[in-house]
Amino acid sequence: MNVLTFLIAAAVSLAVVQADVISHDAVVPFAQPTATTTEQKAGVKFKPQIHISNGCHPYPAVDANGNTSGGLKPTGSSSAGCKGSGYGSQVYGRVATYNGVYAIMYSWYFPKDSPVTGLGHRHDWEHVVVWVDDIKLDSPSIIAVSPSAHSGYNIYYPPESNTIDGYSAKVDYSSSWVVINHALDSTTDAGETQDLIMWDQLTDAARTALENTDFGDANVPMKDGNFLTKVGNAYYA
């Protein structure tokens, strides 16, 4: 091992050692960077809106140094302690081609999934897959929208026109007594957007943290071990 290789390895090891689990409201999100690739530009173009009917608002899950959110215990009201981060929120994106079309996955992290006091679990990840005919076109079209719901998907092919605002799909985060835990679904209600960070725009430390951190009952949908499987499950045909 030469000196340069040793120094790089040492720096990476130090970054991993320094990364920690921190308070959910201490995680600083990534500012949305300038999109430079076709995939990144598509991510920005089709960035969805999320409406919160009940429960936590989305929070950043990881910071640039690889520190991850410790989440919240499922105590208090469904939104207790998680009505929004003072640092701002985050949506995570990743793109794949699948059966000749494009799948853009947008993922949100929530500190807890607690429909009522004492029920639920620490951490929640939800996502929506927006299906686009060809992101290289000047005027691409949304073919389908697949919001995540209880380890599966609500698939809309084609989506109702009033659930799309321009190029932005509108999704709702809510729970009910019937299914207990929170999920996403399409909605006609306008929502909020967050700064987008694409998978390839994350720092190495942040990406490694999302790959390796144990979020308990919640799974990071866009990490390598989950991404393509979930895209396949979200397919509309």
Curated annotation (Swiss-Prot):
What's an example GO BP annotation here?
effector-mediated activation of plant hypersensitive response by symbiont
Disulfide bond sites: none
The residues that carry sugar chains are: 67
Transmembrane recorded as keyword = no
A Gene Ontology cellular component where this protein is annotated is:
host extracellular space
Which compartments is it annotated to reside in?
Secreted
Find motif (Conserved heptapetpide motif) and give its ranges: 120-126
Organism superkingdom: Eukaryota
Kindly indicate whether the keyword Glycoprotein belongs to this entry: yes
> Keywords, A to Z?
Glycoprotein, Secreted, Signal, Virulence
Motif Conserved undecapeptide motif is found at 103-113
List the InterPro entries hit by this protein, alphabetically: NPP1 (IPR008701)
Query: Which coarse location class describes where this protein primarily resides?
Result: secreted
Please list which residues make up the signal peptide: 1-19
- Report the domain remarks: The structure of NLP effectors is remarkably conserved with a high level of conservation of a central region containing the conserved undecapeptide motif AIMYAWYFPKD and heptapeptide motif GHRHDWE.
Membership in a protein family: Belongs to the Necrosis inducing protein (NPP1) family.
What the protein does comes down to: Secreted effector that acts as a pathogen-associated molecular pattern (PAMP) recognized by the plant immune system. Induces necrotic cell death and ethylene biosynthesis in parsley. Stimulates early induced host cellular responses implicated in elicitor signal transmission such as increased levels of cytoplasmic calcium, production of reactive oxygen species (ROS), and MAP kinase activation.
What is the designated name of this protein?
A: Necrosis-inducing protein NPP1
Q: From what organism does this protein derive? A: Phytophthora nicotianae (Potato buckeye rot agent)
Name the lineage: Eukaryota, Sar, Stramenopiles, Oomycota, Peronosporales
> Gene name, please?
NPP1
